[in-house]
Amino acid sequence: DEFYKVRFADVKRRILISQERGGSDNSKHLLTKMQTKALKLNEQFDELYSELIREMARRRIFLVNEHQLDDTQKRWVTKYFRKEVMPHITPLLIKEDIDVLQFLKDEYAYITVDLQKGDQSQYALIEIPTDHLPRFVMLPEKKGKRRKTIILLDNIIRYCLDELFKGFFEYDALNGYAMKMTRDAEYDLRYEVEFSLLEQMSEGVNQRL
């Protein structure tokens, strides 16, 4: 996250400044290399995540999503949502006259909701209330089975989207997608020739204190 907040954001700013001034810049090439590296890191993360899930399963710990719940778990999740989750969430309807960025908090996770009616879509934003609730929720154990089942709070909300929107909006289908907000650190570092690297770093650190 720190990399995207500072270095990645800085390179993108350089590109925008270069475009405004009509000059050439190596930043586009650098950005491409950074994106390629980020994709490789994501692939490594996916591999490690898959291995972690397999190791958890060997220890009889299972991470499930909303599509893997049985009927008993569905009923429990719905009750948990109504009692514990719903009081802490307020969907934000996304409209053209609303500056969504002013509502997004840095380092917070959200679910974007697509409410579809015919060929039209309306969008809403839900902050995942991790300030009030655990991100990982343990489902009740089944009698006679020595296994632990865990579900993400995100998936509980996705499963219960109808609980939030039914009766307030007309829709044929709705889908939720997880996202996380990582803001540009906006260090305002100056890159004049006379500034040494040490001076630039010192200025950046001072802005963070």
Language-model segments: what does each one mean?
Residues D1-L209:
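N-terminal non-catalytic structural scaffold regions of very large proteins
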